[in-house]
């Protein structure tokens, strides 16, 4: 098959007629498929169901002499802090264990910077005229929603194969109103990029003009390989301390895609000084998070080695789904020259870049044919993709058979949108 751009107008018209007919056939199937969010499938959730049988007798609820059924331990039970320190490669004293969502802790961290200021703030951010934030793109839509909700001016910085464009980042942080930066350093959402060692070093070594700059390190996929062995990653907290930036980084992780998205455990890791500061503030809003759930996770996951064994089981379920999507893109899209895409080996997403001006149209056609996907523009601040080209595919939820149907629809819609753009 020729690339669409190399076809004659007559060839494109013939191709358009064939693709349009295929699209109408797919519409007539009455499909209702969803690839919108990176949800674990039922089969993955079933792997973890035995966690609910671990606490049955009264004595089971005691950990390190603490009865987890009672009040207290705002920063998390010691056993949970040890577990997540082991997984993240930091110290237990640097870990705060919260409720089921790391996103809540991210929101809380930004919120407290606005209401109270951080340890090195001259004043709470709500009293500042302007707050700006660095946003690597394409990125995670919910990160952008957090900063947008506080009226922050978000500055897009392009991602490269090594991570964010560090030359641009290092220039931006010279502005004292630039107060933070979002990061998903391992298997980034949505591209699956792993930050290089040099990028991580440059981030840790930054000297921002703002004394209270927040390096937000969302390590959501720290153990989420599906097509390779576990990849060790630098301890950003220790690295920042080595460069004199001990209080700059705030690391986040959760078990949302290890155990249950709706009943997992979210954590924040940072310097001991930051953990003490946030514990003091959070102690006003809660007397403690769900310590019973924290203990369940300690007993079920045990340590990093056992957790990685569980992640291999998740990987065995996920890998065929990613392969199904990538195989379809290889066969149906790559030869036509109408999109580029990444081949992740970890994380939960596949990122596709269409020809400029085709993402919204592709997704509108998908919806018409019964396939729901992440909205166009979601991977950019304010939901505005300047090229209207990036699409995030989430293969994890549907069974492989449904996924193959959904990706067939996607490929057909992408072809149709590209042909329309080329004037077929």
Model region roles, listed by residue range:
Residues 38-42, 102-103, 139-141, 162, ...:
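Short, solvent-exposed loop/turn segments at secondary-structure junctions
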Residues 60, 66-211, 222-244, 359, ...:
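Conserved core of the PLP fold type I
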Residues 98, 238-319, 332, 419:
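Conserved core segment of the aminotransferase class I/II
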Residues 351-356, 373-415:
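Conserved PLP-binding active-site segment of the aspartate aminotransferase-like
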Residues 362-368, 406-411:
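Short amphipathic alpha-helices in soluble, non-transmembrane regions
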């Amino acid at each position: 098959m020729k690339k669409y751009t190399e076809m004659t107008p007559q060839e494109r018209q013939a191709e358009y007629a064939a693709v349009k007919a295929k699209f109408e056939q797919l519409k007539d199937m009455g499909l209702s498929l969803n690839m919108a969010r990176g949800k674990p499938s039922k089969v993955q959730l079933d792997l973890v169901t035995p966690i609910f049988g671990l606490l049955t007798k009264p004595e089971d609820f005691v950990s390190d002499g603490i009865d987890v059924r009672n009040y207290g331990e705002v920063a998390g039970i010691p056993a949970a802090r040890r577990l997540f320190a082991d997984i993240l490669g930091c110290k237990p004293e640097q870990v705060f264990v919260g409720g089921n969502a790391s996103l809540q802790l991210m929101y809380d961290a930004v919120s407290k910077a606005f209401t109270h200021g951080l340890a090195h703030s001259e004043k709470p951010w709500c009293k500042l005229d302007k707050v700006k934030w660095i946003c690597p793109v394409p990125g995670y839509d919910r990160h952008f929603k957090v900063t947008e909700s506080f009226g922050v001016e978000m500055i897009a910085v392009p991602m490269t194969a090594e991570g964010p464009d560090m030359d641009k980042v290092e220039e931006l942080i010279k502005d004292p109103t630039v107060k933070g930066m979002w990061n998903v350093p391992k298997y980034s959402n949505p591209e699956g990029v792993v930050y290089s060692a040099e990028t991580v070093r440059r981030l840790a070594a930054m000297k921002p003009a703002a004394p209270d700059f927040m390096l937000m390190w969302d390590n959501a996929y720290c153990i989420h390989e599906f097509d390779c062995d576990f990849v060790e990653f630098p301890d950003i907290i220790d690295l920042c301390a080595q460069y004199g930036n001990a209080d700059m980084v705030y690391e986040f992780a959760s078990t949302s895609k290890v155990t249950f998205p709706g009943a997992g455990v979210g954590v924040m890791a940072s310097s001991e000084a930051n953990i003490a500061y946030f514990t003091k503030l959070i102690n006003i809003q809660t007397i403690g998070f769900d310590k019973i759930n924290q203990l369940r996770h300690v007993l079920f996951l045990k340590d990093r080695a056992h957790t990685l064994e569980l992640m291999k089981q998740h990987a065995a379920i996920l890998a065929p789904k990613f392969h199904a999507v990538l195989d379809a893109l290889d066969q149906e899209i790559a030869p036509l020259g109408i999109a580029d895409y990444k081949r992740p080996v970890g994380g939960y997403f596949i990122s596709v870049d269409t020809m400029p001006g085709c993402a919204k149209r592709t997704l509108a056609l998908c919806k018409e044919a019964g396939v729901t996907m992440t909205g166009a523009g979601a991977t950019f601040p304010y939901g505005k993709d300047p090229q209207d080209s990036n699409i995030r595919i989430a293969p994890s939820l549907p069974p492989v058979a449904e996924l193959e149907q959904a990706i067939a629809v996607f490929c057909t819609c992408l072809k149709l949108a590209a042909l329309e753009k080329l004037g077929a």
